[in-house]
A protein has these predicted regions:
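N-terminal catalytic or cofactor-binding beta/alpha core of small enzyme domains
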Residues: 1-86, 99-108, 129-142
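A short secondary-structure junction signal
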Residues: 27, 94-95, 125-126
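Short, hydrophobic/amphipathic alpha-helical patches that form generic packing surfaces
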Residues: 92, 96-100
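Polyanion-binding loop/helix "lid" in catalytic or ligand-binding cores
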Residues: 87-91
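A structured phosphate/pyrophosphate-recognition subdomain
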Residues: 113-125
Length: 142
């Protein structure tokens, strides 16, 4: 479905979002790895392989503008961290498959993943403010 939407809409930017309840801060994910956890997802599905894409690259770096992310979040005083592991679960799989598709299809779309923390640890208004400003900055730069 995501591939179909990408092909139809031809976005310049894709920001993937997911929740990481163990995180205390919003996190910019730098890389997705070609690895799956063997634990069940919310629907009960358990992968039969440890690879997301059998002959895919071991890792694929986000192409979202991190420097702009850092500048924007510092300007808005939104706390964040730079993360070098999107995990081995659903969020990482989504990030990996999306980046892999964009690369294979020779698309120039900027793409990355941002993990949202437990909202008891960082306020929703702080997160929304930072993300809004970042999205506006990305639009201005494209």
């Amino acid at each position: 479905l995501l591939k179909e939407i990408i092909d139809k809409e031809e976005p310049k930017i894709i920001i993937l979002l997911g929740e990481a309840r163990s995180y205390s801060l919003l996190s910019f994910e730098v890389i997705a790895i070609n690895e799956l956890s063997n634990k069940a997802d919310n629907s009960g599905f358990i992968p039969k392989t440890n690879k997301i894409i059998e002959k895919g690259p071991d890792g694929i770096f986000a192409t979202l503008n991190y420097q702009l992310f850092e500048e924007t979040f510092n300007k808005t005083k939104t706390k964040f961290k730079r993360s070098y592991s999107a995990g081995t679960y659903v969020c990482n799989s989504l990030m990996y498959q999306t980046l892999n598709y964009l690369k294979a299809a020779n698309k120039t779309t900027e793409c990355g993943f941002i993990h949202l923390p437990d909202l008891n640890k960082q306020s929703l208004s702080e997160i929304v403010n930072g993300l809004n400003e970042y999205i506006l900055s990305l639009i201005d730069n494209n």
